Curated annotation (Swiss-Prot):
Keywords: Cell cycle, Cell division, Cell shape, Cell wall biogenesis/degradation, Isomerase, Peptidoglycan synthesis. This is UDP-N-acetyl-alpha-D-muramoyl-L-alanyl-L-glutamate epimerase. The keyword Zinc does not apply. It is an enzyme of class 5 (isomerase). It catalyses: UDP-N-acetyl-alpha-D-muramoyl-L-alanyl-L-glutamate + ATP + H2O = UDP-N-acetyl-alpha-D-muramoyl-L-alanyl-D-glutamate + AMP + diphosphate + H(+). GO terms for cellular component: cytoplasm. Cell wall formation. Catalyzes epimerization of the terminal L-glutamate in UDP-N-acetyl-alpha-D-muramoyl-L-alanyl-L-glutamate. InterPro entries: MurL, MurL_epimerase. The gene is murL. It comes from Xanthomonas oryzae pv. oryzae (strain MAFF 311018). GO terms for biological process: cell division; cell wall organization; peptidoglycan biosynthetic process; regulation of cell shape. The combined activity of MurD2 and MurL provides an alternative route for incorporating D-glutamate into peptidoglycan. Its EC number is 5.1.1.23. One of its GO terms (molecular function) is racemase and epimerase activity, acting on amino acids and derivatives.
Length: 451
């Protein structure tokens, strides 16, 4: 029997959290039962931070929210039946938000591990509903999350065009993201996050492992960083398509990118304004756009062609990293190549990737999954099936693409089964749907997106 037996653990504990204003280091402490403490640290540059009065209260609220949400990385190792919060208490609204993050954010993890989480995740409610958080007089400035891919770069350029002061922000030590961030020419904020080293040992000892809602964790980190820096906006770049999951026969919808979707954005953003700071806005600038609309926007500038990468193999915590920015075989590479193809010259796209992914017959299976042909949409941050089908149909009508192996196969085997009315590009370019973008800003960026 291994030293860590996930089936024998009864309680996951949120032991304590603290922030050292002199160093900017937040310490998040967890434990299973009476086992050793699991200590994670998050380091926000710019210390020392002067915290007093309402600002200190808001920072404490944000710190506890981060402690609760970041705990998902450790909770999943055993998924025990009980949860305890040792050093503070939470109200029903906080418990509901965090339970939702754990339940839906671990949806793919539960599906892959054959676990049933519904009704199993209960955060203890021991506090009365809190009074509404006050406005703090935060200065107008955006912390913009950058991930190294096309989406955040579209947001950064749209905010630049709209005249919004911004700081390009990321978490962790990715050199690829740093290169992209520096390419923007804007101020940067690189936040450090060090997971408890014991977590990797638990994984070796048979802990449950799998995908977590990392955007939820990063959102909580950036809310804390925004308060420490006294700024009023945290901006992500999640588009409309992120709200749609993979349809699994016998299971229903499982959304790999749930914390990039509208349900999370709405719940988290509303919570922050009610419980943390009334004038701190959390929103995704691209929410009203489809993946294809974002791709069209990105194609308007070649400023980042030699720097960006959406390839997930560059970003796995553990595992191989390709020498090139694009591995060419993962679902993200497949999708981004396909999404950009209708909107830029073929030579430019092939230059970016270093090869033509659509003229390689061995890639057909990967594209079938994107098209939802004989397979479900991959568990990746990729667009809806109809977006992929529409993009492929556009290429099928173009002389420069229609002889390429994957496109040719689409024309022969797949397109005849599809309704041409479902393959129109214009509806996918519509700017529509709910969002949390401040109204005055939305008027400015909407005009830019519509061109």
């Amino acid at each position: 029997m291994s030293a860590f037996d996930k089936h024998q653990i009864s309680t996951f504990r949120f032991v304590r959290c603290a922030l050292d204003a002199q160093t900017g280091v937040a310490t998040l402490v967890y434990a299973f039962d009476q086992g050793p403490e699991l200590v994670e640290t998050v380091a926000v540059p710019g210390a020392p931070f002067a915290l007093g009065g309402a600002n200190a209260t808001a920072v404490q609220q944000a710190l506890q929210l981060l402690h609760l949400i970041a705990g998902v990385s450790y909770f999943k190792a055993a998924v025990p039946p009980n949860i305890a919060i040792d050093s503070y208490s939470i109200d029903a609204e906080t418990a509901a938000l965090v339970q939702s993050v754990y339940l839906h954010g671990l949806g793919e993890f539960a599906y892959r591990n054959g676990l049933q989480l519904h009704g199993k995740i209960r955060f203890p409610v021991a506090a009365q509903a809190a009074a509404a958080a006050p406005a703090l007089g935060l200065r107008v400035h955006a912390l913009v999350a950058i991930g190294g891919g096309k989406d955040s770069l579209v947001s950064i350029e749209a905010l630049r065009h709209a005249g919004v002061d911004q700081t390009v922000s990321w978490i962790g030590g990715s050199q690829l993201i740093r290169a992209c961030a520096e390419r923007t020419g804007l101020p940067v904020l690189n936040i450090g996050r060090v997971l408890a080293p014991e977590l990797f040992e638990l994984n070796r000892q048979g802990a449950w492992n799998g995908h977590i809602p990392v955007t939820a964790v990063n959102s909580a980190i950036l809310v804390l960083a925004a308060l420490l820096n006294g700024v009023d906006q945290v901006v992500f770049s999640n588009e409309r398509s992120a709200s749609y999951g993979s349809q699994i026969p016998g299971t229903g919808e499982v959304n790999h990118q749930w914390s990039k979707g509208w349900a999370f954005e709405q719940a988290f953003g509303d919570y922050v304004q009610r419980h943390v700071a009334a004038d701190l806005r959390y929103y995704s600038l691209l929410r009203p756009l489809s993946e294809l609309a974002v791709a069209r926007q990105f194609a308007k500038t070649d400023r980042y062609d030699a720097h960006f990468s959406s390839c997930n193999r560059n970003f796995h915590i553990m595992g191989e990293r390709p020498v090139h920015r694009w591995c060419g075989v993962c679902p993200k590479c497949h999708f981004v190549f396909l999404a950009l193809a209708p909107f830029m010259p073929k030579t430019r796209l092939v230059n970016i990737f270093g090869r033509n992914l659509l003229d390689d017959a061995t890639q057909a299976g990967g594209y079938d999954a994107l098209l939802e042909f004989q397979d479900h949409k991959p568990f990746e941050c990729v667009g809806e099936g109809r977006e992929s089908r529409t993009a492929m149909a556009v290429l099928a009508s173009r002389a420069e693409w229609k002889e390429d192996a994957v496109v040719k196969r689409f024309i022969r085997d797949i397109q005849p089964q599809l309704d041409p009315n479902d393959l129109q590009v214009e509806p996918l370019m519509a700017i529509e749907g709910e969002h949390r973008i401040p109204p005055a800003l939305w008027e400015r960026v909407r005009a830019n997106f519509a061109v």
